[in-house]
């Protein structure tokens, strides 16, 4: 993060010609287990990772917000918070910032302008929530600059609202919530219905290894919508609000009445919820052998019942599994059809995992992976 801090400070100084008063950060995240459970009112178990979006900021006396994007060649954006805040077709990055500010005002918070420079190293397009980190760090910035009486949960909800309503991208609450509320060496069990969060301690020094298959993700939107409709249909047949309310026993008793495809989708969600709740318990007790089993079962369920993995991702999981055995867990993470796998790896096996993936993955698939070795880190806050 030191480089990011230097970059935002330098950009602030050179473009705005004075020094910032505050440095803030918000992290990206990875979901350890609990896939496609969020929109079924279920449970997820993400952790924040030490790839961040960092902001240098200072208050202004007027109502202007000026933003410098270091990652877009110090491109700037400027808007007046007393005027209508509008969507910018030609500066997509600035819409996340405009949206967050607009939603804060809409929620009744009062503040004046700010000068902001921003840079991040959360890999984009890898499903590690670079957009949520940006939304959360901007909310955090106005909280700190103006001592706003806003909770971390509300900063997260405000970011989600900005993405849904202003940017126009439909997302659940997980990404913003873990970015706002993460804890070092902890994952977070999030109940997507009540939004209740529980910090879950992780074995000390456990590496969180994220490997991007770099398989271009096709069909994501249409397939995602189909899965969602199938889950809603299953919930209707069971007469419940969401699949969260169906036990595996209830499912087994009625599965024969469901369309075969709908039954497979529902079985994934119902068993994944059970796995996620159990994973929170076994992770906290340091039982990595059981965690390994749960992550393997999660992957198999995504592959066979939810049918969202692809051969490249399955190959990556197998390569890592062969190295770590029962010492750690590995599975696909994210929406599916490409994207990343996540592995919990004891530190002494990290180099071996990297070597195996580098030797075998490209040879088997023709694609070159990207590897990120992370630790579970703190959520958003002041750095300086």
Curated annotation (Swiss-Prot):
Cellular component GO terms held in the UniProt record: cytosol
State which pathway it belongs to: Carbohydrate metabolism; galactose metabolism
State where the protein is found: Cytoplasm
The EC number on file is 2.7.1.6
Cited Gene3D superfamilies: 3.30.230.10, GHMP kinase, C-terminal domain
Instruction: Name the residues that bind substrate.
Output: 35-38, 224
* EC top class, as a word: transferase
Q: Which Pfam families match?
A: GalKase_gal_bdg, GHMP_kinases_C, GHMP_kinases_N
Keyword annotations for this protein, in alphabetical order, are: ATP-binding, Carbohydrate metabolism, Cytoplasm, Galactose metabolism, Kinase, Magnesium, Metal-binding, Nucleotide-binding, Transferase
Q: What is its main location?
A: cytoplasm
Instruction: List the catalytic residues.
Output: 175
- In which residues is Mg(2+) bound? 131, 163
Residues reported in the UniProt entry to bind ATP: 69, 125-131
Site location (Transition state stabilizer): 29
A molecular function (GO) term: galactokinase activity
SUPFAM superfamilies associated with the record: GHMP Kinase, C-terminal domain, Ribosomal protein S5 domain 2-like
Per the record, what are the reactions this protein catalyses?
alpha-D-galactose + ATP = alpha-D-galactose 1-phosphate + ADP + H(+)
* Example GO BP: galactose metabolic process
Q: What does this protein do?
A: Catalyzes the transfer of the gamma-phosphate of ATP to D-galactose to form alpha-D-galactose-1-phosphate (Gal-1-P).
Q: Which PANTHER family match?
A: GALACTOKINASE-RELATED (PTHR10457:SF7), MEVALONATE KINASE/GALACTOKINASE (PTHR10457)
The family classification in the record reads:
Belongs to the GHMP kinase family. GalK subfamily.
Q: What protein name is recorded for this chain?
A: Galactokinase
**Organism expressing this protein natively:** Aliivibrio fischeri (strain MJ11) (Vibrio fischeri)
**Organism classification, top ranks?**
Bacteria, Pseudomonadati, Pseudomonadota, Gammaproteobacteria, Vibrionales
Q: Which gene encodes it?
A: galK
């Amino acid at each position: 993060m030191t480089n990011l801090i230097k970059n935002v400070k330098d950009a602030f100084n050179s473009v705005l010609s004075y020094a910032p008063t505050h440095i803030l950060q918000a992290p990206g995240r990875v979901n350890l287990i609990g896939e496609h459970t969020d929109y079924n009112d279920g449970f997820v178990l993400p952790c924040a990772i030490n790839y961040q979006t960092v902001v240098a900021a200072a208050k202004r006396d007027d109502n202007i917000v000026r933003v410098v994007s270091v990652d877009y060649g110090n491109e700037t954006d400027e808007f007046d918070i007393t005027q209508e805040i509008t969507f910018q077709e030609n500066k997509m990055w600035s819409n996340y910032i405009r949206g967050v500010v607009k939603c804060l005002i809409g929620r009744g918070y009062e503040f004046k302008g700010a000068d902001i420079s921003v840079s991040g190293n959360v890999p984009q397009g890898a499903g590690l929530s670079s957009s949520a980190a940006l939304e959360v760090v901007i909310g955090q910035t106005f909280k700190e600059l103006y001592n706003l009486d806003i909770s971390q949960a509300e900063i997260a909800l405000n970011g989600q609202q900005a993405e849904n309503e202003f940017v126009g991208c439909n997302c659940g609450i997980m990404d913003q919530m873990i970015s706002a509320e993460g804890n070092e060496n902890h994952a977070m069990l999030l109940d997507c219905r009540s939004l209740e969060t529980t910090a879950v301690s992780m074995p000390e020094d456990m590496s969180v290894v994220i490997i991007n298959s770099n398989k271009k993700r096709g069909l994501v939107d249409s397939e995602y919508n189909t899965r969602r409709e199938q889950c809603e249909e299953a919930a209707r047949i069971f007469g419940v609000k969401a699949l969260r309310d169906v036990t595996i026993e209830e499912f087994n008793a009625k599965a024969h009445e469901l369309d075969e495809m709908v039954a497979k989708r529902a079985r994934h969600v119902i068993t994944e919820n059970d796995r996620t709740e159990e994973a929170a318990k076994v992770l906290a007790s340091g039982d990595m052998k059981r965690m390994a089993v749960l992550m393997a079962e999660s992957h198999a369920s995504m592959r066979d019942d939810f049918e969202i993995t692809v051969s490249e991702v399955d190959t990556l999981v197998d390569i890592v599994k062969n190295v770590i055995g029962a010492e750690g867990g590995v599975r696909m993470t994210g929406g599916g059809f490409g994207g990343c796998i996540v592995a919990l790896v004891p530190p002494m096996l990290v180099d071996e995992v990297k070597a195996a993936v580098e030797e075998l993955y490209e040879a088997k698939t023709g694609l070159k992976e990207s590897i990120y070795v992370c630790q579970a880190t703190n959520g958003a806050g002041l750095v300086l």
